[in-house]
Regions:
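A compositional/structural signature for long, glycine/proline-rich flexible linkers
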Residues: 27-411
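Sec-dependent bacterial lipoprotein signal peptides
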Residues: 1-18
Length: 411
């Protein structure tokens, strides 16, 4: 989200892929594992959710101009899964498919639309160049196709899982095969290249004036050009939190469904709060909707405090008396992969997956503010850009206090 240059990553050496030769499609090509390693908050920046997993495959379309992709596999057992397609050179999202919109193969059912006991339900999706003749791919369903354009030189596909039953959602990762866009025949899957999505980035950690403000508004993050999740919108704030401060905010969370049958038409599929370091854009603390018991349409209170606050135990005890509250600790002394302490300048993300833009309180209807520099200085229309103004009780507003002020208020 932060518009900073990418820095060299450790991950590049971990993406070991098989080499392959060109194939006309006349001889059935060998299936290759192109997904590489599993990514998570431990090895990926841009403030990922702690409850998500990612797999990335990138190939050079400029060197494979007549090759698209067929991706087939079993529906995973997750809270949510999706495919996102990016222009790897720019990081901009091109297309994507969410679980509820992936039509199952013949004889299978989509378990994200109805509860089912059946196993082995399968899907097939295609990545094709715009203008491709779909009649060449009899198995392709219009709704299961993502498209890219001629000007894309390198294409990245990202598979996302949220809250899977295990690392891979209880199934094998989908098989990726190359397809000839002119003939429809299966060809060798293009060699994988290192995607910019997996390259560690530095954060926007310079101190700005608003970091010291005691009032900490939330604003809508722009989609940006760094591999955003096309299914998700985010409210965020940034601030400096010292070891003698407590940050708290209250709001009514977006309603989320408890049954698969209610996924379609939900106000949002999932929400979470995560805290990351402005220094490296990694996330270190997070919780999601089902981790807190609260009545629908009631306010919750999130309390953020340094793990090194000398009165931490007192803060936790006071928080226990606040209805529907959750305490999040931040340890500014943690040392990251660059050998630097993650510091006390933090970003807090309120994530909504598949927010419903027809709902009057949806963050989808807010106007984004740029997320680099001092974002609060760039607000031009508070009525649509500041969450607690635009959304009322559904929009969080952070307030920082000294530890003493926080505790005295609750005596």
């Amino acid at each position: 989200m932060c518009r900073k240059l990418f820095c060299l990553a450790l991950m590049a050496m971990t993406l070991g892929f098989l080499s392959c030769s060109d194939d006309s499609g006349e001889t059935p090509p060998a299936v290759k594992n192109v997904w590489g390693i599993t990514y998570s908050h431990k090895n990926l920046g841009a403030y990922p959710d702690l409850f998500s997993k990612y797999w990335v495959y990138a190939y050079e379309t400029s060197k494979n101009p007549d090759v698209g992709l067929r991706i087939s596999g079993e529906y995973p057992d997750t809270r949510f899964f999706s495919f996102s397609v990016y222009n790897d050179m720019t990081g901009e999202v091109i297309d994507g498919l969410d679980d509820v919109h992936i039509t199952p193969d013949k004889g299978s059912v989509n378990p994200y639309l109805a509860t089912t006991e059946s196993k082995g339900n399968r899907f097939t999706v295609y990545l094709l160049k715009q203008g491709t003749d779909l009649s060449l791919f009899p198995g392709a369903k219009e709704g299961n196709v993502c498209y890219f354009t001629d000007d894309v030189e390198c294409l990245t596909v990202c598979l996302r899982h949220y809250l899977g039953v295990d690392e891979f959602g209880g199934v094998s990762l989908p098989v990726v095969e190359g397809v000839n866009l002119r003939t429809g025949k299966t060809v060798t899957t293009p060699d994988a290249v290192v995607s910019r999505a997996t390259v560690m980035r530095q954060g926007n950690y310079e101190h700005v004036a608003s970091d010291d403000n005691n009032e900490v508004p939330f604003i809508l993050a722009p989609r940006g050009a760094y591999f955003p999740n096309n299914s998700t919108d985010y409210l965020f704030c940034r601030t400096k939190l010292t070891t003698d401060q407590v940050l708290s905010f209250s709001f009514i969370p977006v309603p989320v469904p408890s049954r698969v049958e209610d996924y379609l038409g939900a106000r949002a599929r999932y929400w979470s709060i995560c805290i990351g370091s402005l220094q490296n854009t990694f996330s270190y603390s997070s919780f999601y909707d089902k981790m807190l018991s609260y009545p629908e349409n009631e306010k919750i209170t999130v309390i953020v405090v340094s793990a090194n606050n000398p009165r931490l135990a007192e803060v936790k005890k006071a928080a226990a008396d606040i209805p529907y509250s959750y305490v999040m600790e931040w340890d500014e002394t943690i040392v990251d992969a660059h050998g630097k302490a993650i510091g006390d300048i933090i970003a807090i993300m309120y994530r909504n997956i598949l927010p419903d833009n027809t709902w009057e309180h949806s963050i989808k209807n807010m106007e984004p503010v740029v997320s680099y520099g001092d974002p609060y200085s760039m607000v031009t229309n508070p009525e649509t850009q500041i969450a607690h103004i635009a959304l009322g009780d559904y929009g969080p507003l952070g307030v920082k206090q000294t530890t003493g002020e926080f505790l005295n208020k609750r005596k």
